[in-house]
Amino acid sequence: MSLRWLGPVVVFAGLAAIGFFPRNHAQAGEVSSITHYKVLAPIRHGNLTVFPVVAATTHDTRDFLTLDEGLRSGDVVVTEYSNLQGMVRRRQPGGGEQRSNRAQVNTLVLVNNSKRPLILLAGEIVTGGKQDRVIGKDRLIPAESDPVDLGVFCVEPGRWTGSSDKFNALGGPMAQPAVRAKAMSDKNQAKVWEEVGKSRSGMMAQVTAASPALAATSSYARVMDNKEVQEKLDSVAVPVERDYRSLIQQLREHNAVGVIVAVNGEIIWADIFASTDLLQKYWPKLVRSYAAEAVGTHAKAQQADEKTAQAFLDNMEGRHQTVESEPGLYRQTEISGDGFKAFELTSLLPKTIFDLHVAKMAE
């Protein structure tokens, strides 16, 4: 049995000024002819502030599949490496058989049987198997793919026994920004575990009487799925989600495509998509991840303003750039600048050559 690993090409470049967003700074409330993005008045609840972002233009993303959609339809299959038998679509010329009698830590494989390319976002949590795991980077999986390495980090230290042979991300959590940042930027399992521990402790501190089962679990997903934790998250996420969904409907013709996130008045994150439709598909997961960051963070509440949010979005001048590419499929660009890192996922598929998602984190 042969296994086709889609191997990206990685290019490093040290540059003085790099930007997939152009370098001028738009005034808050004005659409820049260069950046094409405008930050709107914020939605606030507690210590969480979300700034809607609208675009001058958007793209048709109907040809792309999300992980939730693929799992729901059964077109996408996720399994441990040891369960590959029978999943390979075709043999490669001269390819030998590759077998494994046991699962390998952090090695999941995915098959996309759909006729649409699959979007994977860093931070999506896949539960089941030997451990719960988080996807480590944004990427595209081609339509009707052979098994590919999913590229994950464990978010459940201490367990390496099967809870279920079935993997699921449908309706599951998106890791909060602090955990996403460790997976995307540090790319280090120990640092991911460390941040999971901090996030888990911060969340449990908000639960008045944590159950013994909750206190005993090392699973990030199970903590987030706890009833009392859910109530805490709902108290922040539901009002913000409701207000933003209403705003999206009102601003659909103005191309609402993303958000900038502040916690305790400090800008921490931005998620920008190629279309309103794509944003709406991820919004329920995203807003709860932002709420988890806010609920688990203790600091004196301040307020970020539109000008600060617009400046954060516009500043894409970088000292260093890393480009990872699977020719003809996608390109991921990582930009390191003063006080931030940004990650741009660009489709290279015919007729859909545009940025699908941009994630930007404050450092």
Q: In which residue ranges do the predicted regions lie?
A:
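Bacterial N-terminal signal peptides
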Residues: 9-19
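Intrinsically disordered, low-complexity segments enriched in small/polar residues
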Residues: 19-118, 123-363
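Bacterial N-terminal signal peptides that target proteins for export
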Residues: 1-10
